[in-house]
Amino acid sequence: MNEERLFEILLAPHISEKGALTTGQYVFEVMPDATKPEIKRAVEKQFNVTVKSVRTCNVKGKTTRFRQVRGRRKNWKKAYVMLAPGSEIDIAAGE
């Protein structure tokens, strides 16, 4: 596994209070070709935490319209990361 790729896999956090506060689950937007083991290693390396499980889903882009012009948002991949008990990520600080 290339170390540089680990830092490119996580694109952005998808912040939701419900997931983080109640279940210790964090949601990230990830690269569409990222696999679960890659996502797990990327989160563990960047945030120095222990990951319990990773679930992923592909989100279809919405069809949009501006007057007569139709467009489409891009498809993207979402990863649900469950941390081990006692682990926590401070998304606002980025650590």
Swiss-Prot record:
Q: Does the keyword RNA-binding apply?
A: yes
The record's Gene Ontology cellular component field reads: cytosolic large ribosomal subunit
Gene3D superfamilies from the entry? 3.30.70.330
This protein's record includes keyword Transmembrane: no
Example GO BP? translation
Keywords assigned by UniProt, alphabetized: Ribonucleoprotein, Ribosomal protein, RNA-binding, rRNA-binding
Pfam families this protein is in? Ribosomal_L23
The family assignment reads: Belongs to the universal ribosomal protein uL23 family.
Please describe what this protein does. One of the early assembly proteins it binds 23S rRNA. One of the proteins that surrounds the polypeptide exit tunnel on the outside of the ribosome. Forms the main docking site for trigger factor binding to the ribosome.
Q: What is this protein called?
A: Large ribosomal subunit protein uL23
Q: Which organism is it from?
A: Coxiella burnetii (strain RSA 493 / Nine Mile phase I)
Q: What is the lineage of its organism?
A: Bacteria, Pseudomonadati, Pseudomonadota, Gammaproteobacteria, Legionellales
